[in-house]
């Protein structure tokens, strides 16, 4: 109740303090820092510490008074140690230095940072002539002077100015004032820090922060006051301070209004505690840091009305710790700088605001906070392996032909989602003509979805009596004339119905004109001849009925329709349309060829006129011939490289410049005016070609970079080199610019032309020579990889540079740069696909090995757990067996005790027989046989684990071999056959690893099944043992009760036996007395036989006789009962022996069960 009352009294002050701190900076109340801390104060000089010292002071006007200073013991009345300056020491205690020692210092070394407000010093003797006060805020590492004090500042500290300081580094000297009554002793010095900084424009909080923070304080007495001499002996000169008061509090940076004792600190009673009770969410002994989880802004001392309160970090409930990051604070423009630590619930980020990799935001509104981020639910078959899902939406990164948020659906037109497919799904094997465009096949089954009237597994056939599959809209009915046609089924491609004799037309609806049958031509009257056509490339009747000209199907060409038309790739008879980019390139190239041919025809007239005289013409012609010869030598080499092609291009360029630079008459001026527009069009056409080429090249490089195969990169580089070589040969954009320059040069020459010259004949001869020499056909054949039919010279090279009209390829022995590049590109694609499949198989093998290791670990853990269970069960059963054995011995001893009565024996026997054992002997034996059978079937765990380790080691070895094969495949440079061989070896190794892992998995599953069977048997056994234990506990209590009853009955039996023995003895004595009495009665009867009257004595004798007979009868009856009891005890003893024999048999069975269980426990304990 008292504590509650004190708390009630302190509560208003605490609430007021909180309110004060909530309005701005707050500071604790001040007190004397020296009280309780005098042990931290020291002086550089103290009188009488080693021996007593005498000092003399003036007494009156002309007398001297001398005293002793003995500071060896602190409690001496004349001890003047430094701790006497504390206000708690009393008025008659002071500190005094040694005589004539200067300078002297008093220094206070605090153990914590404190806030100083006021210094007050009372002197005992003369006031020093000069002194200074300084402080340290870093425990004595650096010192700063508060103020210099002197009676004469100019002479004592000439380098220090007087007045008020103007800034924090400005230190001034203040004169010491004299006492008004003229006394020389008992002066005072007071230094108030707020008054000291009164001239500095700063807030009170700033002044306290700059001046009040101290860890050490030092007062240096630098000059003794002059001592007046008025007698024969001068007074002693010394420094003495009677009282030093340091008003201050704990230093809290404006974040606390009270101080608390230091936990675990000194027990000395102090007036000012040194631990701040922090407010504003700050912490630390001096509130010099933000409290845990309040680091959203940097810590700052409180100033005036601004508390600079530390703000709580925003971790969205996923963390309780954070730290301040200046970089984050600057990036947020001073808004928040807290960075959360140890984010939980699978979150991360400076505010735990986003989910970790492979987790995404739970979109369920009522989800608990620990389920904010849930694992990605990507389908491993359709998602890119290892790629994380989107952290906000959960959208997985799908393979190329897979879609859906979980990547569990094939895109339209694809089916068969599998993990092994690097693209996820494969294209539907459906006809592009007969299947639906929006969904060619079903995503799950791959069954093709046909257009109307289209049938077949691949939707590649028209339904009966339908045709025109190529329309792409489904098949149409044949509409055969039912009277004039042989059947309703028409040709699926042409729609031609089978007509009766004399009828024709598509539907047999009109009378037929007699003509030669299909695949023949001519007239029926003059005879029909067979068409000379390859009918695999013809359509309809095969050839024209009149001329015999073959009618080629679209995509086929040639006189016999046995060649692929330009724009169709592959080999005859399979002619499919080339890629759309070919059509764009081909159109532009044909336009270019047409314009170049027009230019060539337009410039032919320029060679007929006479040229200007040019003395350097001969040298230029020779130079052209040498370059042509050099080009011919380069082209005759065994291989064509990029440098060779560049030299050929330079040679051709030089020849053209030579030809175009010759001085000729230019008669066709009107044609020259149109050349500028033609060249501009050609320039724009080549610019478009160049952009298309670069775009395709970038796409190809991007696709190539996704495949890490070294062989693929090598082949790609080879293809790029060949492509650049072909591009340099076929690129004419630079030639057009050169033609433009040549045209300008020709115009200059035209302006210089003033008449005839002597070079016309030479030009004509050169023109004739250039028309036939050099022959560029071999060079073109090397570049194009095929035989050119028409000759190509610098003067005349008709047609395309690499004609493809016949559509034939150069075959496997092609040596052309362009076909080689194409072949290399296709080969690279196949190798890249094989490498991707190989990587997928390696990943699957890794997963299988990891699963096997985890399964082995689980089996080992199960075995250890089983061992622990068996060991525990063994200990429990041993304890139960020991208790059972002791109980049996006690029961046996109890039953064989001769003093135990039959009723007690019967109760014990019935209690023993009422015990419920696990089952009868047959059932126990059957359970033991089941356990033995299961144990016999259970494989040796050590051997299985050893085999498992061997299998895992073998799998790892095979995996290493596969990795080496893959590395060798990556290191191949051009050896494609070796790459394929290594891939086959890797596939074989992977198959062996998979077989090994499957065998290991079977072994592990067998172990797990056996462990389960053992557990199924052990669990009932444990329950039986526990049941026996409970019954034995109850039986034990019952035995104790029966033993107590038996002991009581035994005591009663002993008492009854004693009574029976006494009664028997009395009966024997009575019988003997009766015999004697009977004998005397006979004698008396004989003596008194005459008298029939017995008298009084006779009556007495008769009564005695009757009593004796009654007593004898009772005695005989008691003897009979004792005999019956003896026989009954004999029968009980025999029953006890029988029951004891039964218990011995049961004890043997229990021993057998325990021995067997101990054996199995030992076996399983060593199987780990």
Swiss-Prot record:
Q: Kindly state which keywords UniProt assigns to this record, in alphabetical order.
A: Basement membrane, Cell adhesion, Coiled coil, Disulfide bond, Extracellular matrix, Glycoprotein, Laminin EGF-like domain, Repeat, Secreted, Signal
Segments carrying the region annotation (Domain alpha) are 782-812
Compositional bias ranges of the Basic and acidic residues kind: 740-750
**One cellular-component annotation, GO:** collagen-containing extracellular matrix
List this protein's GO terms for biological process.
Answer: brown fat cell differentiation; cell adhesion; endodermal cell differentiation
Assign the protein's first listed, main location to one coarse class.
secreted
Signal peptide feature range? 1-17
Laminin N-terminal domain boundaries = 22-249
Q: Does the keyword Cytoplasm apply?
A: no
Which residues lie within the region annotated Disordered? 723-760
The annotated regions of Low complexity compositional bias extend over 727-739
Matching InterPro entries: EGF-like_dom, LAMB1-4_helical, Laminin/Netrin_ECM, Laminin_N, LE_dom, LMN_ATRN_NET-like_EGF
Which positions does UniProt annotate with glycan attachment?
Answer: 220, 601, 806
Q: Tell me where in or outside the cell this protein is found.
A: Secreted, Extracellular space, Extracellular matrix, Basement membrane
Q: In which tissues is it expressed?
A: Found in the basement membranes (major component).
At the top level, the lineage of the source is: Eukaryota
Which residue windows are coiled coil? 732-754, 827-879, 944-1129
Stated role: Binding to cells via a high affinity receptor, laminin is thought to mediate the attachment, migration and organization of cells into tissues during embryonic development by interacting with other extracellular matrix components.
| Domain text | The alpha-helical domains I and II are thought to interact with other laminin chains to form a coiled coil structure.
Q: What is this protein called?
A: Laminin subunit beta-3
What is the species listed in this Swiss-Prot or TrEMBL entry?
A: Mus musculus (Mouse)
Per the record, the gene is: Lamb3
């Amino acid at each position: 109740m008292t504590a509650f009352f004190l708390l009630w009294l302190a509560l208003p002050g605490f609430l007021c303090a909180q309110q004060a701190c909530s309005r701005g900076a707050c500071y604790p109340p001040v007190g004397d820092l020296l009280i309780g801390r005098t042990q931290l104060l020291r002086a550089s000089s103290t009188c009488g510490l080693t021996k007593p010292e005498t000092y003399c002071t003036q007494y009156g006007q002309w007398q001297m008074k001398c005293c002793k200073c003995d500071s060896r013991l602190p409690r001496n009345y004349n001890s003047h140690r430094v701790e006497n300056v504390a206000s708690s020491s009393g008025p008659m205690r002071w500190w005094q230095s040694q005589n004539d020692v200067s300078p002297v210092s008093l220094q206070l070394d605090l153990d914590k940072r404190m806030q100083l407000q006021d210094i007050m010093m009372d002197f005992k003797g003369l006031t020093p002539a000069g002194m200074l006060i300084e402080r340290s805020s870093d425990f004595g590492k650096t010192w700063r002077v508060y103020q210099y004090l002197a009676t004469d500042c100019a002479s004592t500290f000439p380098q220090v100015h007087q007045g008020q300081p103007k800034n924090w580094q400005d230190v001034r000297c203040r004169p010491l004032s004299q006492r008004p009554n003229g006394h020389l002793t008992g002066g005072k010095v007071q230094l108030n820090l707020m008054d000291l900084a009164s001239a500095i424009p700063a807030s009170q909080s700033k002044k306290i922060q700059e001046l009040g923070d101290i860890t050490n304080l030092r007062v240096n007495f630098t000059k003794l006051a002059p001592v007046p001499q008025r007698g024969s002996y001068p007074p002693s000169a010394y420094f003495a301070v009677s009282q030093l008061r340091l008003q201050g509090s704990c230093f809290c940076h404006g974040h606390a209004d009270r101080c608390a004792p230091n936990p675990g600190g000194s027990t000395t009673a102090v007036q000012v505690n040194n631990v701040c009770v922090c407010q504003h969410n700050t912490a630390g002994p001096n509130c010099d840091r933000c409290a845990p989880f309040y680091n959203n802004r940097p810590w700052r001392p409180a100033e005036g009305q601004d508390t600079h309160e530390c703000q709580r970090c925003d971790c969205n409930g996923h963390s309780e710790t954070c730290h301040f990051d200046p970089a984050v604070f600057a990036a947020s423009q001073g808004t928040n700088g807290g960075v959360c630590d140890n984010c939980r619930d699978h979150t991360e980020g400076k505010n735990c605001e986003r989910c970790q990799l492979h987790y995404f935001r739970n979109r369920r509104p009522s989800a608990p906070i620990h389920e904010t981020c849930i694992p990605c639910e990507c389908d491993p078959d359709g998602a890119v392996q290892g790629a994380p899902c989107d952290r906000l939406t959960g959208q997985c990164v799908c393979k190329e032909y897979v879609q859906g948020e979980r990547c569990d659906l094939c895109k339209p037109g694809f089916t068969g989602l599998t993990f092994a497919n690097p693209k996820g799904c494969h294209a539907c094997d459906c006809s592009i003509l007969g299947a639906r465009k929006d969904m060619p096949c079903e995503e799950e089954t791959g069954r093709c979805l046909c257009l109307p009237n289209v049938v077949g597994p691949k939707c590649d056939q028209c339904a009966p009596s339908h045709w025109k599959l190529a329309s792409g809209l489904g098949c149409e009915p044949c509409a055969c004339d039912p009277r004039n046609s042989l059947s309703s089924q028409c040709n699926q491609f042409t729609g031609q119905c089978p007509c009766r004799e004399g009828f024709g037309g598509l539907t047999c609806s009109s009378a037929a004109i007699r003509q030669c049958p299909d695949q023949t031509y001519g007239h029926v009257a003059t005879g029909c001849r067979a068409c000379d056509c390859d009918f695999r490339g013809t359509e309809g009747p095969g050839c024209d009925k009149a001329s015999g000209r073959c009618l080629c199907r679209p995509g086929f060409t040639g006189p016999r329709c046995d060649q692929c038309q330009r724009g169709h790739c592959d080999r005859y008879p399979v002619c499919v349309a080339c890629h759309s980019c070919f059509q764009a390139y081909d159109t532009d190239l044909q336009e270019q060829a047409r314009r170049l041919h027009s230019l060539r025809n337009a410039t032919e007239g320029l060679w007929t006129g006479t040229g200007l005289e040019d003395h350097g013409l001969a040298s230029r012609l020779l130079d052209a011939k040498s370059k042509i010869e050099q080009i011919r030598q380069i082209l005759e080499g065994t291989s064509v490289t990029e440098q060779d092609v560049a030299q050929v291009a330079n040679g051709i360029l030089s020849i053209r410049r030579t030809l175009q630079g010759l001085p000729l008459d230019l008669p066709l001026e009107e044609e020259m005016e149109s050349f500028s527009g033609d060249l501009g069009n050609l320039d724009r056409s080549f610019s478009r070609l160049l952009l298309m080429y670069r775009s395709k090249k970038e796409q190809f490089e991007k696709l190539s970079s996704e495949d890490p195969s070294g062989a693929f990169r090598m082949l790609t580089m080879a293809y790029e080199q060949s492509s650049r070589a072909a591009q340099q040969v076929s690129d004419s954009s630079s030639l057009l610019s050169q033609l433009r320059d040549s045209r300008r040069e020709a115009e200059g020459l035209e302006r210089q032309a003033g008449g005839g010259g002597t070079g016309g004949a030479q030009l004509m001869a050169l023109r004739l020579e250039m028309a036939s020499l050099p022959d560029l056909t071999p060079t073109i054949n090397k570049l194009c990889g095929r035989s050119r039919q028409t000759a190509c010279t610098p003067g005349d090279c008709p047609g395309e540079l690499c004609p493809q009209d016949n559509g034939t390829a150069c075959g496997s022995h092609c040596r052309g740069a362009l076909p080689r590049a194409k072949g290399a590109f296709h080969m690279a694609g196949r190798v890249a696909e094989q490498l991707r499949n190989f990587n997928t198989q390696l990943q699957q093998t890794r997963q299988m090995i990891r699963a096997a290791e985890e399964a082995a670990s689980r089996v080992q853990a199960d075995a250890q757990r089983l061992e622990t269970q068996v060991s525990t069960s063994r200990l429990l059963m041993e304890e139960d067996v020991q208790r059972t054995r002791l109980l049996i011995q006690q029961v046996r001893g109890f039953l064989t005790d001769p003093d135990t009565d039959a009723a007690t024996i019967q109760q014990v026997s019935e209690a023993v027989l009422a015990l419920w054992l696990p089952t009868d002997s047959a059932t126990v034996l059957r359970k033991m046989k089941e356990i033995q059978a299961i144990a016999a079937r259970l494989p040796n765990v050590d051997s299985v684990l050893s085999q498992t380790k061997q299998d895992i080691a073998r799998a790892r070895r095979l995996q290493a071999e596969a990795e080496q094969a893959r590395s060798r495949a990556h290191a191949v440079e051009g050896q494609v056959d070796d790459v394929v061989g290594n891939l086959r070896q890797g596939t074989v190794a992977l198959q062996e690893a998979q077989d090994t892992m499957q065998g290991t998995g079977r072994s592990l599953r067998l172990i797990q099944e056996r462990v389960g069977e053992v557990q199924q048997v052990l669990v009932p056994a444990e329950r039986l043992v526990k049941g026996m234990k409970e019954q034995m506990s109850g039986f034990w209590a019952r035995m104790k009760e029966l033993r107590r009853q038996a002991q009581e009955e035994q005591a009663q039996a002993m008492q009854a036996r004693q009574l029976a023995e006494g009664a028997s003895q009395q009966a024997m004595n009575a019988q003997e007395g009766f015999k004697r009495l009977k004998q005397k009665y006979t004698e008396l009867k004989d003596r008194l036989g005459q008298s029939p009257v017995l008298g009084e004595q006779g009556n007495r004798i008769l009564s005695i006789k009757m009593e004796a007979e009654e007593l004898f009868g009772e005695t005989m009856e008691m003897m009979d009962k004792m005999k019956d009891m003896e026989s009954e005890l004999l029968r009980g003893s025999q029953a006890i022996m029988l029951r004891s024999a039964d218990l011995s048999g049961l004890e043997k069975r229990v021993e057998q069960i325990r021995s067997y269980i101990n054996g199995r426990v030992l076996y399983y304990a060593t199987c780990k």
